[in-house]
């Protein structure tokens, strides 16, 4: 896989082309990603680069984490992320920023979707509601039957039912990079990306890029 970067969702806006076409974009702040470890096949069995981003108070860093960051001689960040590599070399302390992307490139953006709490089947799985009238009472938003009788005598795994919705890992694929602002460490991506404003995002070159 090709290396990506970790960023923070700033929100959405729009920009205009020279022809006056409005393009909705998500603004992603790409703070410099600090390399904390470079893994090789000889030492770890695979090639990867491990990065951290942002800052974290010393009181919020465990002793094990503090030792790991100190060994790499980098400041403690708000998390640790890893990218598999097929080629390229990095050293602890190297910086990776938004300049690895270019305008017009397609990227995959991964984040944690907004949590919706406990949701019914209509909101969670787009079930249709039952009749409002015609003899129906107190069953307008219920899912209906969830299985058969004695055979098989159980509810199949994976049955779509009510439950916790959102707050899960989501990847949106093949979004176009509209603009790269290297001075302000900003990446403008066409369309919406998962998660709330301020959430962590992982931006990688598109795995299924067309052409």
Curated annotation (Swiss-Prot):
Family, similarity comment: Belongs to the universal ribosomal protein uL3 family.
Q: What is this protein called?
A: Large ribosomal subunit protein uL3
* PANTHER family linked: 50S RIBOSOMAL PROTEIN L3 (PTHR11229), LARGE RIBOSOMAL SUBUNIT PROTEIN UL3C (PTHR11229:SF16)
- What organism does the UniProt record list as the source? Pseudomonas fluorescens (strain ATCC BAA-477 / NRRL B-23932 / Pf-5)
Q: What domain of life does the UniProt record list for this protein's source?
A: Bacteria
Q: Which NCBIfam families match?
A: L3_bact
Which is an annotated GO molecular function term of this record? structural constituent of ribosome
InterPro entries tied to this protein: Ribosomal_uL3, Ribosomal_uL3_bac/org-type, Ribosomal_uL3_CS, Transl_B-barrel_sf
Q: What does this protein do?
A: One of the primary rRNA binding proteins, it binds directly near the 3'-end of the 23S rRNA, where it nucleates assembly of the 50S subunit.
Q: How is it modified after translation?
A: Methylated by PrmB.
Q: How does it assemble?
A: Part of the 50S ribosomal subunit. Forms a cluster with proteins L14 and L19.
Q: Which GO terms describe its cellular component?
A: cytosolic large ribosomal subunit
GO-annotated biological processes: translation
Assigned keywords, A-Z: Methylation, Ribonucleoprotein, Ribosomal protein, RNA-binding, rRNA-binding
Record's Pfam families? Ribosomal_L3 (PF00297)
Point out the gene that encodes the protein.
rplC
Q: Which Gene3D superfamilies match?
A: 3.30.160.810, Translation factors
Which residues are recorded with the post-translational modification N5-methylglutamine? Answer: 150
């Amino acid at each position: 896989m090709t290396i990506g970067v970790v960023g923070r969702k700033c929100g959405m806006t729009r920009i205009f082309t020279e022809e006056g076409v409005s393009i909705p974009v998500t603004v992603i702040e790409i703070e410099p990603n600090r390399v904390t470890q470079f893994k090789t096949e000889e030492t770890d069995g695979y090639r990867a680069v491990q990065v951290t981003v942002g800052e974290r108070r010393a009181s919020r860093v465990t002793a094990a984490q503090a030792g790991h960051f100190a060994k790499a001689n980098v400041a403690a960040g708000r998390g640790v992320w890893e990218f598999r590599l097929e080629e390229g070399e990095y050293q602890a302390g190297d910086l990776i920023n938004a300049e690895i992307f270019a305008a017009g490139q397609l990227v995959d953006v991964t984040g944690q979707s907004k949590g919706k709490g406990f949701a019914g089947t209509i909101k969670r799985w787009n079930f249709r509601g039952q009749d409002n009238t015609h003899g129906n009472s107190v069953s307008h938003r219920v899912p209906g039957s969830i299985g058969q009788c004695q055979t098989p005598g159980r509810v199949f795994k994976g049955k779509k039912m009510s439950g916790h919705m959102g707050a899960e890992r989501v990847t949106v694929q093949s979004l176009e990079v509209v603009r790269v602002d290297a001075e302000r460490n900003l990446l403008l991506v066409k369309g919406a990306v998962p998660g709330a404003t301020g959430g962590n995002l992982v931006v990688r070159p598109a795995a299924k890029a067309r052409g």
